[in-house]
Structure formats: C-alpha cells, structure tokens
Swiss-Prot record:
Role played: Cell wall formation. Catalyzes the addition of glutamate to the nucleotide precursor UDP-N-acetylmuramoyl-L-alanine (UMA).
Organism lineage string: Bacteria, Bacillati, Bacillota, Bacilli, Bacillales
Catalytic activity: UDP-N-acetyl-alpha-D-muramoyl-L-alanine + D-glutamate + ATP = UDP-N-acetyl-alpha-D-muramoyl-L-alanyl-D-glutamate + ADP + phosphate + H(+)
Key word Cell wall biogenesis/degradation present: yes
Gene: murD
Name of the protein this chain belongs to: UDP-N-acetylmuramoylalanine--D-glutamate ligase
Family recorded in the similarity comment: Belongs to the MurCDEF family.
EC number: 6.3.2.9
Class of the enzyme per the UniProt entry, highest EC level: ligase
Locations listed in the record: Cytoplasm
NCBIfam families, alphabetized: murD
GO cellular component, as recorded: cytoplasm
GO terms for biological process, alphabetical: cell division; cell wall organization; peptidoglycan biosynthetic process; regulation of cell shape
Record's keyword annotation contains Nucleotide-binding: yes
Length: 450
C-alpha cells in the first residue's frame, strides 16, 4: 500500500455500509481519518454497523440526517447503490463536498496498476477471462470490484509487479475523481438503470468515466461495433485499441479466416474456443486485447480459451442428461441477454423463462424463437411470455408456478441433442432474492433429474 497522508485527521463520511462501505471505513480508519459511518438500516438489524462501532467509529443508523454534513466533512465515500438524488448527497454537492466511491480509494492507495472493465453486458465474463489469461501468462493479476474481493481490500496488499483487474459498474464510475486505469475497456452500451441515471445518455457518460483520467501512456479498449461506445470514447487521451467481430482491425483485435487476430498477428483459432455464443467473441476479443497489451503470450491465451466454459449463471453449462445439455443463464435479467443466449445455439431449445414484471411485453424475443421448440414459463411475466410464444407459433407452451416444476416440464418436452436453457429475460425478485439464488435452484432441480 502506498503511504497516503491525505486522509489523516480528516472527517470522512462513509454513506451506506454493505461490503464496500465496511471495507472503505476500515481502510480510512487505518489511514488516520476520523470516520463517521451512516446507514439507512437500524443499528439493531445491522451487524456490520455494530462491528464498525466496536472499532471506535461514530456510527449513525436508521436514516441519513443532513446534520451529519455539519461536522466539517471533507469527503463522502458513498455506496454505489445510493442514488445521487438522495437528499444527503444533494446537500453534500451543494456544499461542494467531494463524493467518491470505494474504487477511487482503492486506486489512490494501490501500488499496482489497474485494469478497469465496464459495459452493459459481458463485464463479468470479460473480467474473469482477463484474469485467467494474465494468470496463465504469469502476469500476477488480482481480481476486485463487483466480483472477487472489495477493491480497497485488494489494493492494500497489491504489489507493484501485480495488476488489479476490476469489473466496474456505472454506479461506481460516477464516483471517481483521479482513478486512472492503465487499461480501460468499454464493452457495449444498452439502455439500463434508467431509474438511477435518468437517461441512456447519462448512463453512458457515467460508463465513459473509465477513460476520464487516462493519458497517452494508457490504453483504451473500445468496441468498434457499438456506435454509442465509439462516440463516448471519442475524447479519450489513451491509445485506442479497437476490437470488432464484424470487420478487420489492423491495429486492434478482430476475427479473420476463422481465427482471432491482434495487431495483425493470429492468436487463436475460433475452433479452439469452448465458450459458446457470438456475443462471447466480443468479450474474448476485449480480454485478449488487454492480455496482449500486458505481454501475455498467444500460448497462454489459447490454453485459457480451450478450458474456459463461462462464469456461473452466465450461459453456464450445467450437465448433460440422456444427451440433453442443460445451461444456466439466470443472469439474463433482460430481453437482450436472452436474445444473445438464444442466438448461441443451433440445436433445438427448450426455454425456461419468466420473472419480475417490469411492465414490458416480450414481442422483441419472437425473431429469436426460431430454434425454440418449447417454452415453459413461470413467475409474474408468465402470461406475457405465453402471448409472445403464441405469436411466434410455438407448438409447446406451458406455464407453471415454480422453477422446480419448470425444470421437470422442460425435461419432459426435450429429446436427445436438445438444449434445455434457463434464460429468464426478467429480474428474479418476484420469487427469489437474487439471480444467483434462481440459478442455484435451477442447478439443484436439474441434478434431481439424474
């Protein structure tokens, strides 16, 4: 960890606890700050808050009183999930108190350079691929951010010869000031999180903060097939490394003659890649670009791509039962993700879909039903998905109450060489706490079939 004195004896407000807030508060106390911790949950229900209080911190729970800002606060470190429209953040902004997220702290104390990966879809897969490629290439990566350990915990122990690989959300990137990744990657942009950002433009601008402080000594890895990403990255001062699945890129990454190329050099044959899905080729090109920029060999990259089958809950291969392959894509919480999952297979598909009703219809899925032979729906959106399936002319359409029932029905409708795919196209919160819980229940139900 760098020797950092800027926080000594400063009054710093950590807003929202959870994992990142807890880690930030602990770090700031270690750096000599006077830490005030504030969380909306009552102290009686807040184990982490009680632990911080036991460490001698001033803890205020059960709301976000504006009076906290009267304590000569020099910095607010906010939980990424707390919107900037929250009155205490509005007031802090009016008082010109800097507001950052935990990843900014991590960067300021780290001896190791950062790789920052953002985008609407594919962040986790790309981050894991990058980590695995760098690890295979003996480049000493550590993983942090939305996956792995909280960034400021990792950064404390990171050495100069290591590299911190971080998955970054728009929420985190809104709160950066000096954060300057050596390599920043912007994968794609789709309309999302409008309840937080208001408009797609504001959402995109938050994502583009990943390039904000880069210089000509840094690299900006950019999806050349995404017009929004190209526009948002136009002003980056980093060296642009473009990647594309649709056109040749001489000074970047592309697909040519059934192989992946980087700066004109063949790296790996497409046939060596076991991860399914056209969309995953974009993720692979981005990860490969980062790995090559950090000196990873083609051999190391190929070894990883021959074994990497995906990230849990993201088009994850589960098992094969009587020549039916089961895939868990519980992370598909919107139609776009399900469209990509359906496009990944040429075999007949039995689709399990449904979940929280956010008011949208599912007609956009109809063109992607061409390989779907049967659909089993569940959750709040089941009737809407049934309507879309009927419009698509599917012969086998069923609705059930639970995911366990859906798995049994899906297996009954499948035949040898079919794919049984959970890709809900909806959030999970109508029946499950998280998409991870939904995916785990699917996997358990599949194994009960054996």
């Amino acid at each position: 960890m760098k020797t950092v004195t800027e926080f000594q004896n400063k009054n710093i407000l950590v807003l929202g606890i959870a994992k990142s807030g807890y880690a930030a508060a602990t770090l700031l106390q270690k750096l000599g700050a006077n830490v005030i911790v504030n969380d909306g949950k009552p102290l009686a229900d807040n184990v982490l808050a009680a632990e911080l209080q036991a460490k001698g911190m001033d803890v205020v729970c059960g709301g976000h009183p504006l009076e906290l800002l009267e304590r000569n606060i020099s910095l607010v470190v906010k939980n990424p999930g707390i919107p900037y429209s929250n009155p205490i953040l509005v007031a802090a902004k009016e008082k010109e108190i800097p507001i950052v997220t935990e990843v900014e702290l991590a960067y300021r104390i780290s001896k190791a350079p950062f790789v920052g990966i953002t985008g609407s879809n594919g962040k986790t897969t790309t981050t894991m691929l990058t980590f695995e490629m760098l690890k295979e290439g003996q480049k000493h990566p550590v993983i942090a951010g939305n996956i792995g350990t909280v960034a400021c915990e990792v950064a404390q122990d990171a050495k100069e010869n290591e590299v911190v690989v971080t998955e970054l959300s728009s929420f985190q990137l809104m709160g950066v000031e000096s954060f300057q990744p050596k390599i920043a990657a912007f994968l794609n942009l789709f309309e999302a999180h409008l309840d937080y950002h208001g408009t797609k433009k504001e959402y995109g601008l938050a994502k583009a903060n990943v390039f904000k402080n880069q210089t000509e000594n840094d690299y900006s890895v950019i999806n050349a097939d995404d017009a929004d990403v190209m526009e948002l990255s136009a002003d980056t001062k980093g060296q642009k490394i473009l990647f594309s699945t649709t056109k040749e890129i001489e000074d970047g990454a592309c697909i040519k003659d059934n192989a992946l190329y980087f700066k004109g050099e063949k790296v790996v044959e497409v046939s060596d890649i076991v991860l399914p899905g056209q969309h995953n080729l974009e993720n692979i090109l981005a990860a490969m670009s980062i790995a090559k920029l950090l000196g990873t060999s083609n051999e190391a990259i190929t070894v990883v791509l021959k074994r990497f089958t995906g990230v849990k809950h993201r088009l994850e291969y589960v098992t094969t039962i009587n020549n039916r392959k089961f895939y868990n894509d519980s992370k598909a919480t919107n139609m776009l993700a399900t469209e990509k999952a359906l496009s990944a297979f040429t075999q007949p598909i039995v689709l399990l879909a449904g979940g929280l009703d956010r008011g949208n219809e599912f007609d956009d899925l109809i063109p992607y039903f061409k390989n779907v032979k049967a659909i089993v729906t569940f959750g709040q959106t089941a009737p809407k998905l049934v309507r879309a399936a009927e419009k698509a002319g599917l012969d086998i359409i069923e609705s059930v109450d639970t995911l366990d029932e859906a798995v049994v029905k899906a297996y009954a409708h499948s035949k040898e060489d079919d794919v049984v795919l959970l890709s809900p196209a909806c959030a999970s919160w109508d029946q499950f706490k998280t998409f991870e819980e939904r995916g785990d229940i699917f996997i358990q139900a599949v194994h009960k079939l054996i």
